[in-house]
Amino acid sequence: MIRPRLTVLSRAYCHLCEELLAALKQYQGRYDFEIEVVDVDRHPHLEEKWGDKVPVLLDGDREICHYFLDVAAVDARLARMR
């Protein structure tokens, strides 16, 4: 079975990015999923689309939340991935 993957759009020296990632990692104890971290500044098309919202948590190309971890939205999304 393929593990679900969530993507965190991040950038260097971003304290909100670090906080969102740390909070998200706590969910890996309850849900089995991978976290992919992508630096938006290395991908011009991502920076153009998402740069003002970083950090952004995505499921595929669908936004779950940005700036801060939205606990309710993450719980709902991860519950559907089971």
PLM region descriptions:
Residues 33-44:
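Thiol-based oxidoreductase modules, predominantly thioredoxin-like and allied folds used
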Residues 78-82:
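Ser/Thr/Gly-rich flexible loops in soluble cytosolic domains mediating phosphotransfer, phosphorylation
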Residues 54-63:
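A short, hydrophobic beta-strand/beta-hairpin element that forms part of a small beta-sheet core
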Residues 68-73:
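N-terminal, polar/charged subdomain of small-to-medium soluble alpha/beta proteins
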Residues 1-26:
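Local sequence-structure signature of Cys/Sec-based thiol-disulfide redox active-site neighborhoods
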Residues 42-55:
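Short Fe-S-cluster ligation motifs
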Residues 28-32:
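Short helix-capping segments at alpha-helix termini
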Residues 7, 36, 64:
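Short, flexible active-site loop motifs that bind/organize anionic cofactors or intermediates
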